[in-house]
Amino acid sequence: MQYPVDTHTHTVASSHAYSTIHDYLAVAKQKGVRLFATTDHGPAMADAPHFWHFVNLRVLPRMVDGVGILRGIEANIKNRDGEIDYFGDYLSQLDIVLAGFHEPVFAPSDKVTHTEAMINTIRSGKVDIITHPGNPAYPIDIEAVVTAAAQYGVALEINNSSFEVSRKGSEANCTAIAKAAKALGATLVMGSDSHVAFSLGGFDRALSIIDAVDYPKDKLLNRSPMALLDFLTLRGHQTVADFIPHFRDEAI
């Protein structure tokens, strides 16, 4: 089954990625992906796009040939206080805000520090999805993080790329996160973390985790465009109302 939503992609605006928006649209049409988010790295990363890149995402069309393009960012968690590298009114102009740990911005430390930073990010109200929380370089108190995510309505990502090209050793942590999410009622989302368009909508390894723990598919944000749009609306992103006329008649 091809899930029709991908919340985590990178373009050539992040110089270690290799595809354009046009490339992603072409692959989306081929694979049946109906809605994807462009989420290049936040400006604190050395090769990330300039701040203005995110401000000017407003020039992107909402829909192209039946495919929706969400304007987003994968921000960097900067410190123990859970601060990220994108701020103020500019956040309200984005459709979706992801954030996670990245070594060039937040050096790996200890479990207590990582847990506090992640929970403070969740509590901040600025971030919709925590990316690759199962990264073994950043051990966390899984139960505490998942409890906070459930309480504050923030989704946790099962990152497909973590099992294929980066963050080796993530499988055990991601399985534990998925089990805890099922038990505690937290929302999960699969992210391709695509750095080349061919990977768009690629969730095979992440889905194997979801299936292994029998996580309820009706809580998985990838299940339909409206599932994600309803989630983002509840998170306060009024901008996503632009998409609803295009998808509201589809099953959630």
UniProtKB/Swiss-Prot annotation:
Q: Where does Zn(2+) 1 bind?
A: 8, 10, 74, 193
Q: Which GO terms describe its molecular function?
A: phosphatase activity; phosphoric ester hydrolase activity; zinc ion binding
Q: Does the keyword Metal-binding apply?
A: yes
Per its UniProt record, the required cofactor names are: Zn(2+)
The record, for InterPro entries, names: Phosphatase_YcdX_put, PHP_dom, PHP_phosphatase, Pol/His_phosphatase_N, Pol/histidinol_Pase-like
Residue positions annotated to bind Zn(2+) 3 are 74, 102, 132
Recorded GO cellular component terms are: cytosol
Among the GO biological process terms of this entry, one is: bacterial-type flagellum-dependent swarming motility
Q: Which SMART domains does the entry link to?
A: POLIIIAc
Q: Which SUPFAM superfamilies match?
A: PHP domain-like
Q: Which family does it belong to?
A: Belongs to the PHP family.
Q: What's the protein name? A: Probable phosphatase SO_1652
UniProt organism field:
Shewanella oneidensis (strain ATCC 700550 / JCM 31522 / CIP 106686 / LMG 19005 / NCIMB 14063 / MR-1)
Give the lineage: Bacteria, Pseudomonadati, Pseudomonadota, Gammaproteobacteria, Alteromonadales
